[in-house]
A protein has these predicted regions:
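Catalytic-domain carbohydrate-binding cleft regions of carbohydrate-active enzymes
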Residues: 1-207, 214
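Accessory, solvent-exposed terminal regions and/or long lumenal/extracellular loops of proteins
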Residues: 208-296
């Protein structure tokens, strides 16, 4: 911070209460095992509930050799984790995406690209975390504490309050039993509705991670980029799902501390029923606005 005024990026695996003020955290030297993939979800949710929201696991596992199937499923968890990082030890099979077969590479690319498209949603959640302490990756019990079905639910999680992710965590499975809490939920891609307070068996072939959006939910996305900074983020696309809802979107330059001096924008989106668009109100204008805001 003293040298170039840009926000620092620090990563550690040894931490204590309060570390979240200084560093992101990863969960240590895991192994390329399905059991360790299953552990990743409660580990990251527990860290978030303990105040350490910016955390992740070694995608694919650090020790031993990762299989193509395990890598595909781990990437589907990592893409929604606050810290998304593939990492492995010397002596294990190389885990770069291109070291795998073409099918695995295609699936890996799909979820990395989805991550890039979801950056404005994730950024909003980090902003919310800074203001309130709410984690980015959340156990369902955080928002549905009166629903006993969520008390010991470790196979799915929320990203913010609007997006529910239910990854496959068992070897060889191509279907997923998903619990949806109260309300109506919509498939992220197809917008097919599901009534809550019940379990569903949904298809989940190797290239699919079940995702659901809460009724009235809105998910901001950017146009696909291959890396941050490849193109200007001047167009915001807002995915709208049926139901009444509001959404606060935050925008700044993503690089320095100018936001502390007011160099940021806040947009309040309001949506009702089955409308295809939402109204937009500028709550705060201190930065370059988007050229386009699109709805889908």
């Amino acid at each position: 911070k003293e040298n170039d005024k840009r926000r620092p990026f620090v990563i550690t695996r040894a931490c204590y209460a309060g570390t979240q003020k200084y560093s992101t955290v990863w969960t240590g030297d895991n192994q390329s095992l399905w059991a360790h993939l299953r552990m990743a979800v409660p580990q990251l949710c527990n860290l978030g509930m303990s105040g350490i929201a910016f955390a992740g696991t070694d995608v694919g596992g650090f020790g031993a050799d990762c299989t193509p199937e395990l890598m595909c499923r781990w990437v589907q968890v990592g893409a929604f984790s606050p810290l998304f990082r593939n990492h492995s030890s010397v002596g294990s099979t190389y885990q770069e995406p291109w070291q795998f077969d073409e099918k695995t590479l295609r699936i890996y690319r799909k979820f990395v690209e989805l991550r890039y498209q979801l950056l404005p949603y994730l950024y909003d959640l980090f902003h919310e975390c800074e203001l309130t302490g709410l984690p980015v990756m959340r156990p369902l019990v955080l928002h549905y504490e009166n629903d006993p079905e969520t008390w010991n639910l470790n196979g799915e999680f929320l990203v913010g309050e609007n997006l529910l992710v239910a990854p496959v965590l068992e070897q060889g499975e191509t279907k997923k039993i998903v619990y949806l809490p109260e309300g109506t939920w919509y498939d992220y891609e197809t917008k097919k509705p599901y009534q809550g307070k019940q379990y569903y068996m949904v298809d989940a072939p190797l290239d699919t991670c079940p995702m659901f959006v809460k009724e009235g939910g809105m998910i901001p996305t950017y146009e696909l980029a291959q890396y941050v900074g490849e193109k200007p983020y001047d167009t915001l696309k807002m995915r709208i799902y049926p139901g009444d809802g509001t959404y606060l979107h935050y925008q700044d330059n993503g690089e320095d501390f100018a936001y502390r001096d007011g160099a940021y924008n806040e947009y309040m989106f309001t949506h009702k029923g089955n409308e295809k668009e939402a109204s937009v109100q500028m709550n705060k204008e201190g930065y370059t606005k988007y050229k386009n805001i699109l709805f889908e």
